[in-house]
């Protein structure tokens, strides 16, 4: 088995695949097929446009437009809670929250909440981690505890007031 570099970068597909499976215990799929980290590495090297995914069984996703998401990221930087998030191209920021909690944000029309869905992951083209779901400051691999969606609410509400005020 390849030695995983720590912490993995968005471009290091092999290290990411190992972190997803070994550290986070997420099932890994490449182009829809369940794979091992080694298979994922090989498939991504052969086809850089391949899509790496997981089943979002251990978390919910909260996706918002990029402008709103950028403001949320600024707000959460001041929070004691860490919110794993990744960018989807130039259009969307997706936050990972504790499984089953995303529904508490269902009243926010700008947010798309998904539970149990297939979730594309970096290093898929166009995706990059803003805040990965592991502690980048730890001496070794350490998964972050995903926050409850209500912990994201204050930052979302603050950002929404700003965005709706400029509409």
Regions found by a protein language model. Give the residues of each.
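Signature for HUH/AEP ssDNA processing cores
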Residues: 1-90, 99-101, 114, 137-138, ...
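Aromatic- and Lys/Arg-enriched surface recognition patch
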Residues: 102-141
């Amino acid at each position: 088995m390849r030695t995983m570099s720590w912490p993995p970068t968005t471009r290091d597909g092999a290290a990411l695949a190992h972190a997803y499976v070994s550290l986070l215990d997420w099932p890994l799929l490449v182009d829809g097929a369940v794979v091992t980290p080694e298979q994922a590495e090989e498939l991504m090297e052969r086809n850089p446009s391949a899509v790496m995914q997981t089943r979002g069984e251990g978390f919910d996703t909260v996706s918002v437009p990029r402008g709103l998401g950028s403001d949320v990221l600024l707000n959460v930087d001041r929070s004691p809670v860490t919110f794993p998030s990744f960018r989807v191209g130039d259009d969307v920021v997706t936050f990972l929250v504790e499984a089953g909690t995303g529904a508490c944000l269902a009243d926010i029309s700008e947010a798309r909440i998904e539970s149990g869905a297939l979730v594309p992951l970096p290093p898929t083209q166009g995706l990059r981690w803003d805040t990965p779901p592991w502690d980048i400051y730890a001496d070794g691999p350490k998964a972050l505890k995903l926050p409850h969606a209500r912990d994201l609410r204050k930052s979302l509400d603050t950002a929404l007031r700003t965005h709706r005020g400029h509409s």
